[in-house]
Amino acid sequence: MKYISFFIFTTSLSFFTFAQPNGGSGANDTDLQLNTITTSLPFMAITPDSRAGGMGDAGTALSPSSTSIYWNTSILSFAKQKSEISMSYTPWLRQLTNDISLSYLSAYYKINKTHTVGGSIRYFSLGEITFTDASGNVLRDDKPSEFELTGAYAFRLAKKLSIGINGKFAYSNLTGGMPIAGVNSKAAVVGATDLSFTYYNDEAKLGKTKGVYTFAITFNNIGNKVAYSELSKRDFIPMNMKIGNAFTADFNSYNKLTFSIDLQRLLVPTPAKYEFIDGVNTLLSGKPNDIGIIAGMIQSFSDAPGTVSKDENGEYIKNADGTYKVEKWSRLKEELSEINIAGGLEWWYNDVFALRSGVFYESKNKGNRKFLNLGASLKYNTLAIDFSYLASLSGRGSPLSNTLRFTLRFNIGGVTTAKVESN
């Protein structure tokens, strides 16, 4: 029962925060300055499947499927199916162009009650791009692309506990070797890993309603920094952490309802605040981010620069020790604003038909992604078809508006009945 109480508390806190992005005691977005965190290879963090894509991207603690390799490999230890393969397709940024897309192929296989293996291929096509010189003369047309290969392994520690690890190789070729601003460019190559942990209780109760409670933590895309030329600065890839809660209520043999909540944040340093003062690029607040991977992950929890104070003349105010004054609580407010909140619902009828809905919230100072998702599924024997639709809540002109996702899933191994005894 204590786990259900934690789920309710986390859910309530998340929706309270989502519902008050512009209210409260000065903790609103307008108190902070625009300070978006950017990374290289952002395609590694795009939701590939239409199930989580129909639930506000709250996929970390959802019941296992082949697309769990992206969200949370450790949950595959609790899969009811022996194996599954899925194919997903997402036309991307169709408000801007019509030839960018993400394709995703994933599969898993349960070796026995303890060991599960899987893999996935992610391919991101940026469409056709025309390269020109400084005078606007056409040099050539090219079709830049990026891809990622993932190997996955889940190990069941106990009846209700599991861990997972992914090994990844990613390749990003955005320029086709063309010189950019007179500098030779190159493809970016990444080696990365995902780590995940799941607590899974299929004997949970919410009041008198029986169901399944899942709590999961994942650390994703932990890998090397990359650059597209020998002279450019090496940038972080989208390393991130997700904390997920989900409860599936089994009302009867026909109806199941899942509530899912994710808290997500990048594990990448926040850009520091610099300003040219007397011709010198001066650090006003925050911390330099030209550091290593592990140091960057740790620093990401305490490096928000906040809002630097100004006097009535618009000049930055200095402290007695020569540092610059920062508005009270603004650093903490900015750190908290880096947490994205995702929530979703899923209703299944007779394990044949499903409807989904969800919301996603990101601070306007950190990217301003706010959207509503709708989704549906049809399942017949070993085949399932998933669909989702994204409606932007960030205002008119969002490039994410009207995003569609499609997924086909095939159960190719029957049902596994193996159980693990409680330790």
Residue ranges: model-predicted function:
Residues M1-G23:
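Bacterial Sec-dependent N-terminal signal peptides
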Residues Q20-N423:
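Subset of outer-membrane beta-barrel
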